[in-house]
């Protein structure tokens, strides 16, 4: 299909690693221990923020404006009919109004946990559930999404993705 996809989590990790402004703000919020040997200590940061809503909100307030700015710059450099921004917490940070359309990709909780564990073995079930606890339920997200893709079976998922793609091309 050739649609460029901006992975917000990966870009955020990169920005938190390279942006002097973000590094300084994160150290101010979480202390110098947030970086170990010049690299973001994701384990430390996760332990600090995922059980402290106030710290999580403060970290989001630091990181997400930088990600938004980076996304806009990236999107403007693309030449496709449309772009996709993959982001897990659109509704939680109140950025849903930035998008023309929201595509929610969902799966059963157990499937999500299994996939996250396969993608990054350093995760624990408890850590994943702590992050999920800070996210809205899929049922709440469905109410505000334009498209819903059930991602349980790869063949059915491909059909749904192609349907959404065709519909978006017709709306542009």
Describe these PLM feature segments:
Residues 10-79:
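ATP-dependent small-molecule kinase phosphotransfer cores
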Residues 10-13, 34, 108-111, 130, ...:
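Short, acidic/turn-prone active-site loops that include or flank metal/cofactor-
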Residues 1, 23, 27, 109-117, ...:
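An amphipathic alpha-helix signature
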Residues 6, 103, 147-149:
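Hydrophobic/aromatic beta-strand patches that form the interior of the parallel beta-sheet core
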Residues 79, 97-98, 119-168:
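Small-molecule kinase domains that catalyze NTP-dependent phosphoryl transfer to phosphate-bearing small molecules
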Residues 69-77, 82-117:
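ATP-dependent NMP and nucleoside kinases share a basic, alpha-helical "lid"
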Residues 9, 59, 84, 149, ...:
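Residue-level signal for inorganic ion chemistry
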Residues 1-7:
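A conserved segment at the C-terminal end of the G1
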């Amino acid at each position: 299909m050739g649609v460029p996809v901006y992975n917000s989590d990966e870009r955020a990790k990169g920005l938190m690693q390279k942006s002097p402004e973000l590094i300084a703000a994160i150290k101010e919020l979480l202390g110098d221990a947030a970086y170990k040997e010049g690299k973001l200590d994701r384990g430390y940061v996760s332990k600090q923020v995922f059980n402290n809503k106030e710290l999580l909100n403060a970290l989001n307030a630091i990181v997400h404006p930088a990600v938004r700015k980076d996304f806009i710059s990236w999107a403007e450099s693309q030449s496709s009919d449309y772009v996709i921004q993959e982001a897990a917490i659109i509704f939680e940070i109140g950025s849903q109004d930035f998008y023309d359309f929201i595509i929610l990709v969902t799966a059963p909780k157990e499937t999500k946990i299994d996939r996250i564990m396969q993608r990054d073995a350093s995760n624990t079930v408890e850590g994943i559930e702590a992050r999920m606890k800070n996210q809205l339920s899929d049922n709440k997200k469905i109410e505000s999404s334009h498209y819903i893709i059930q991602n349980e079976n790869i063949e059915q998922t491909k059909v749904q993705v192609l349907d959404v793609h065709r519909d978006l091309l017709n709306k542009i």
